[in-house]
Amino acid sequence: MPAQDNDNNTSAFVNEFLAGWDDDDPFRSPSPETAGTNKTNNKKRKEPDTLGIDKEIDVTKKARVPRVKLDDARLLSDKGIPKLRKTASKLKLKGKGHEFSDAARLLSFYQEWLDDLFPKATFVDALAMCEKAGHKTTLRNARLKWIAEGKPRSTTAEEEEDRDREGQPSASAEPTRMAPIFEKATGAKSKTPTLDNNLFGDDDIYNATPRRNQPTAAPGDIPDDDELDALMAEAESGAAPGASKATNNGAASDSIFGGGAINRRPRPSEVPDDDDLDALMAEAESYRPSTTNHGSIFGNGSASGGGKDKPAMAAPPQEDDDDLDALMAEAEMHASLATKTTGKESTSRERTSEQDGGKDAQNYDEDDLDAWMAEAEAYTKTTSIQVAQPKDTDDDWEAEAAMAEMHGF
């Protein structure tokens, strides 16, 4: 019995050991179990296949990943320009003498920022995209806002902006500060204007009443016809004590229109021109010789003298208005003729003096001028003596009044 048990164990071991060798043998005959399984598999494969046409097909689109762009929204994000503004303080530039290293440091700073913001593009392409996006309205407004934040401003303006943002009503504005000197000036009371000459008078102290502008005559203005007639009459009737000396020297002492001397333009040959000769002749006719002292045809020249003459001058007999007008007309006609003749002769003498060299021109003109002035004085003297006639005392009072009016001019 024990021998049979050993044979059974040995055969079982051999069968188990050689069980796997038949699978690898291509020439072995198939076992009945494996043949049945192969038949079932072949039947399944031979079933007609319709390629899924009869079945419903569900078409599902895959969701696309959003494409990242470097636009204005990305530049305004936290990784964009706000981050660049925060980290700008870390950039240190050395300045003069280190331009190349500073430029390299600046470019590397921007490159690191763009690599973090938009890593898909190169540095040059990212800069071009930033420039293109910078022309949009949103970035323009943001840039203006950043510039305004960098400007200095007062604390009151900042407080008002904070209140507006929070929606609180703004308190009353603080009064503007002012220097003490201006505070004193504004706090002082206004004084009433006063007049220097008339403090308590009835004049308008505030100058509110409109007044008529009074024309002021310039010193060189020409008097009107009435004043000229009055001055000519007084000049013809009066005599100057130093007229003869002035005429001998070739120049008049005083003008009938004032105390100013005539401005003459000097010439190389010291020969007076036509205008100077005319002026000298007109002044010469207004004077009489110093040997005879006659008073004014209107009296002694004082309104309150009562008809009494000065002791130094004897009052000549007065004449009426018609004789005075005739005398004035005749004197003016003679003066105009003398002036024209003198002008012609002076111009002819100037031409001859220029041709001869101007040696004796000055002496020649002075002698001729003295002759004309002497003739004019003699004519004035004889005319005044011939027309002089006695007159009543009532006419003297009228003459004195006329003389006072002339002094008023």
Curated annotation (Swiss-Prot):
Ranges of biased composition (kind: Basic and acidic residues): 342-359
Domain of life the protein comes from: Eukaryota
Any single Gene Ontology cellular-component annotation: replication fork protection complex
Region Disordered, annotated ranges: 20-51, 150-367, 388-409
Segments of skewed composition (Polar residues): 31-40, 288-301
InterPro entries, sorted: Csm3, TIPIN/Csm3/Swi3
GO MF, one example: DNA binding
Biased composition (Low complexity): 230-246, 400-409
Protein's cellular compartments: Nucleus
Any Pfam family hit: Swi3
Alphabetical keyword list: Cell cycle, DNA damage, DNA repair, DNA replication inhibitor, Meiosis, Nucleus
Biological processes per GO annotation: DNA repair; DNA replication checkpoint signaling; meiotic cell cycle; replication fork arrest; replication fork processing
Function as written in the Swiss-Prot or TrEMBL entry: Forms a fork protection complex (FPC) with tof-1 and which is required for chromosome segregation during meiosis and DNA damage repair. FPC coordinates leading and lagging strand synthesis and moves with the replication fork. FPC stabilizes replication forks in a configuration that is recognized by replication checkpoint sensors.
Complex formation: Component of the fork protection complex (FPC) consisting of tof-1 and csm-3.
Family: Belongs to the CSM3 family.
Name this polypeptide is given: Chromosome segregation in meiosis protein 3
Native source species: Neurospora crassa (strain ATCC 24698 / 74-OR23-1A / CBS 708.71 / DSM 1257 / FGSC 987)
Gene: csm-3
